[in-house]
Amino acid sequence: MKVFLSGSIRGGRQMLPTYQFICRFLRNKGHEVLSWHVADSEVEGKESLLTETQIYERDMSFLQDSECMIAEVSMPSIGVGYEVCSAIKKGIPVMCVHMPDSNVSAMLLGNTYADISVRLWG
């Protein structure tokens, strides 16, 4: 399955080990992680070589090609929220995961849309 992994990049990289774990887990299960750059420890340096438009177009292209999204939402991020909304609009199923004691938005926790789920993990 083609998976879009969403996680905070500019909002903070504290969850990087978690993104790397999720990416590795999905790949080991035979899934293709299109947005693997989220789990790349060098992503900020690599993205500094791209324009904002190039980053947006790349990510939206990955999302368009995805069969589902996994969004790590423990770290508040406008970008992750935008990607989740974009996936919902495109009819792409979304699973949001978060660590215990995370302050997850009510916009996710209270969402009753059938193709979005929020799960505690860790």
Curated annotation (Swiss-Prot):
Class of this enzyme: hydrolase
E.C. number: 3.2.2.-
Record-listed substrate binding positions: F4, L5, S6, G7, S8, I9, R10, Y19, H37, E83, S105, A106, M107
GO biological process: deoxyribonucleoside monophosphate catabolic process; nucleoside metabolic process; nucleotide metabolic process
Coiled coil: none
Keyword terms, alphabetized: Glycosidase, Hydrolase, Nucleotide metabolism
SUPFAM superfamilies for the chain: N-(deoxy)ribosyltransferase-like
Pfam families for this protein: Nuc_deoxyrib_tr (PF05014)
Gene3D superfamilies the UniProt entry points to: 3.40.50.450
Known partners and oligomeric status: Monomer and homodimer.
Protein family per UniProt: Belongs to the 2'-deoxynucleoside 5'-phosphate N-hydrolase 1 family.
Role noted for this protein: Catalyzes the cleavage of the N-glycosidic bond of deoxyribonucleoside 5'-monophosphates to yield deoxyribose 5-phosphate and a purine or pyrimidine base.
PANTHER family: 2'-DEOXYNUCLEOSIDE 5'-PHOSPHATE N-HYDROLASE 1
Protein name: Putative 2'-deoxynucleoside 5'-phosphate N-hydrolase 1
Biological source species: Methanococcoides burtonii (strain DSM 6242 / NBRC 107633 / OCM 468 / ACE-M)
